[in-house]
Amino acid sequence: MAAEQVEDNCISFVEMKFINNTLYFVAENDEDLESDHFGKLEPKLSIIRNLNDQVLFINQGNQPVFEDMPDSDCPDNAPQTIFIIYMYKDSLTRGLAVTISVQCKKMSTLSCENKIVSFKEMNPPDNIDNEGSDIIFFQRSVPGHDDKIQFESSLYKGYFLACKKENDLFKLILKKQDDNGDKSVTFTVQNQH
């Protein structure tokens, strides 16, 4: 039995150019090159909790807040407690690219535009032709903790979704992660069947 020939994945460059102190290579054939983008894959239905075991919940004002809620109450409060996490194929390798949406009366997708966390009334797009987006987060496991997750903004490097107490509410915010073991940026994600 003969071995199959492996396709050549090399790019032949025919020219180099300096533009504004940056060296660019011109490919002989760029048909197979892929531009930076995110492409939507399959969704997962999930419940998201902070480390105080409070459930992420969409309140009447369409704002993401955390509330004390036993597991038995989560299905009764669906769809405000069930989040649709769409995974995206990323043309760069930076972690699992996801959007976080909720289907209450209408589909809303989590955004961190201008570093303010809110839900935008929109379906997550099939493709995002950019390497950063206010609705794309990189879902990463916390080293040494299989069940702990962090969500880093693709638009604001080093900024993560976090839980913060404001007055009597625990809100979902975007914050720069500090190096002191900040637990406010860590969550558990429980996938639903």
UniProtKB/Swiss-Prot annotation:
GO terms (molecular function) for this protein are:
cytokine activity; interleukin-18 receptor binding
The record ties this protein, via CDD domains, to: beta-trefoil_IL18
> Key word Hydrolase present in the record?
no
Q: Does the keyword Secreted apply?
A: yes
As for subcellular location, the record says: Cytoplasm, Cytosol; Secreted
**One cellular component GO annotation, for this chain's record?**
extracellular space
Propeptide ranges, please? 1-36
Top-level taxonomic group? Eukaryota
- GO biological process annotations for this chain's record? cellular response to lipopolysaccharide; defense response to Gram-positive bacterium; establishment of skin barrier; immune response; inflammatory response; interleukin-18-mediated signaling pathway; positive regulation of inflammatory response; positive regulation of NF-kappaB transcription factor activity
Q: How is it modified after translation?
A: The pro-IL-18 precursor is processed by CASP1, CASP4 or CASP5 to yield its mature, active form. The pro-IL-18 precursor features autoinhibitory interactions between the propeptide and the post-cleavage-site region, preventing recognition by the IL18R1 receptor. Processing by CASP1, CASP4 or CASP5 induces conformational changes to generate critical receptor-binding sites. The mature form is then secreted and released in the extracellular milieu by passing through the gasdermin-D (GSDMD) pore. In contrast, cleavage by CASP3 inactivates IL18.
Please list every transmembrane segment annotated in the UniProt record, as residue ranges: none
Positions of the record's site feature: Cleavage = 36-37, 71-72
The record's annotation in Gene3D superfamilies points to: 2.80.10.50
Could you list this entry's UniProt keywords, alphabetically sorted: Cytokine, Cytoplasm, Inflammatory response, Secreted
Subunit structure as annotated in this protein's UniProt entry: Forms a ternary complex with ligand-binding receptor subunit IL18R1 and signaling receptor subunit IL18RAP at the plasma membrane. Mature IL18 first binds to IL18R1 forming a low affinity binary complex, which then interacts with IL18RAP to form a high affinity ternary complex that signals inside the cell. Interacts with cargo receptor TMED10; the interaction mediates the translocation from the cytoplasm into the ERGIC (endoplasmic reticulum-Golgi intermediate compartment) and thereby secretion.
PANTHER family documented for this protein: INTERLEUKIN-1 FAMILY MEMBER, INTERLEUKIN-18
Family affiliation: Belongs to the IL-1 family.
Role summary: Pro-inflammatory cytokine primarily involved in epithelial barrier repair, polarized T-helper 1 (Th1) cell and natural killer (NK) cell immune responses. Upon binding to IL18R1 and IL18RAP, forms a signaling ternary complex which activates NF-kappa-B, triggering synthesis of inflammatory mediators. Synergizes with IL12/interleukin-12 to induce IFNG synthesis from T-helper 1 (Th1) cells and natural killer (NK) cells.
Q: What is this protein called?
A: Interleukin-18
